[in-house]
A protein has these predicted regions:
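N-terminal ligand-binding/catalytic initiation module
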Residues: 1-117, 123-125, 132-135
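Short, intrinsically disordered/low-complexity patches at protein termini
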Residues: 130-132, 173
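Conserved beta-strand elements of the Class I
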Residues: 139-140
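Glycine-rich Rossmann-fold phosphate-binding loop(s) that bind the pyrophosphate
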Residues: 144-145
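N-terminal Rossmann-fold NAD(P) dinucleotide-binding loop
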Residues: 148-149
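Gly/Ala-rich phosphate-binding loop of Rossmann-like dinucleotide-binding domains
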Residues: 152, 156-157
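NAD(P)-binding Rossmann-fold cofactor-contacting core
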Residues: 158-173
Length: 173
């Protein structure tokens, strides 16, 4: 077996744009609604009850679509927000693996943190485009963390918003 390509967060950041992601997410939602995507609910395991472990969880999210299979593993450890930011340990971390549907061969392993942040906001951008009343000029963002920031980025180019106030307490990211 040939080792799959590893794609770092920096490499993802260099190529993944909302201009490409939002239409792809829109199509994926259409395909899911049409039954073309096999995606069971995510499995979540709690990681915070054993001594020495910070409260958090670990989730696995498999999917099959077209010629590919994929799985995202993600962790959420809210206590990491209290750690020294210089350590670079985030509250959410993820890995995305892409596999061939015909052979099962691993094709790529990607850092999934940025992918997750952008994908979540892109889903909201698709919903906002479908549901936003004509002529709306303001959209409230509930929260002030990483997701609020990414939602503003995703919605900024797709709406004619003049104001996007955030509602929530600011915490260091």
């Amino acid at each position: 077996m040939v080792l799959p390509m590893y794609i770092s967060e920096q490499a993802v950041r260099a190529v993944l744009t909302y201009e490409a992601l939002i239409p792809a997410i829109r199509q994926a939602l259409i395909d899911y609604s049409a039954g073309l995507i096999d995606q069971p609910p995510r499995t979540i395991l709690r990681a915070g009850n054993a001594e020495g472990f910070r409260n958090g969880w670990f989730a696995v999210m498999p999917v099959i679509h077209g010629d590919f299979m994929g799985v995202k593993t993600v962790t959420f450890f809210p206590g990491n927000a209290e750690l020294d930011p210089k350590l670079g340990i985030h509250t959410h971390m993820a890995i995305v693996e892409l596999l061939s549907r015909s052979t099962g061969e691993p094709l790529a392993v990607m850092d999934g943190r940025l992918i997750t942040e952008m994908r979540t906001a892109a889903v909201s951008a698709v919903a906002t485009a479908a549901l936003l009343p004509p002529g709306a000029t303001s959209l409230g963002i509930l929260g002030s963390g990483v997701q609020a920031r990414f939602h503003i980025y995703a919605l900024g180019g797709k709406t004619k918003m003049h104001r996007a106030p955030q509602f929530g307490s600011l915490r260091p990211q």
